């Protein structure tokens, strides 16, 4: 049966994402595990002045770092401008 990842693993994912110097915040972190497979979705907040190519590269770098720590993960990252989601941030 699918289930949400434990809080400790979710915190580790947040920590990895927020270590990138261009990531200002994150929100809408969704995780689940199905057997040995892990599914991770999150929105990264970055400077709205970044070019799309730059934002995409940052998301790719974060995805690589998450997959290093969670090799059985399928990761989907959405790029957002900082502040677009107000109080939803960091969750």
What residue ranges belong to the model's regions?
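Alpha-helical transmembrane segments and adjacent TM-loop junctions that form the membrane-embedded core
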Residues: 1-91
């Amino acid at each position: 049966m699918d289930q949400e990842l434990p809080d400790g693993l979710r915190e580790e994912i947040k920590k990895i994402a927020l270590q990138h110097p261009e990531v200002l915040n994150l929100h809408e972190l969704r995780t689940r595990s199905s057997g040995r497979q892990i599914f991770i979705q999150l929105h990264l907040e970055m400077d709205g002045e970044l070019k799309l190519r730059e934002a995409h590269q940052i998301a790719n770098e974060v995805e690589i770092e998450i997959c290093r720590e969670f090799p059985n993960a399928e990761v989907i990252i959405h790029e957002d401008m900082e502040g677009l989601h107000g109080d939803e941030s960091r969750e």
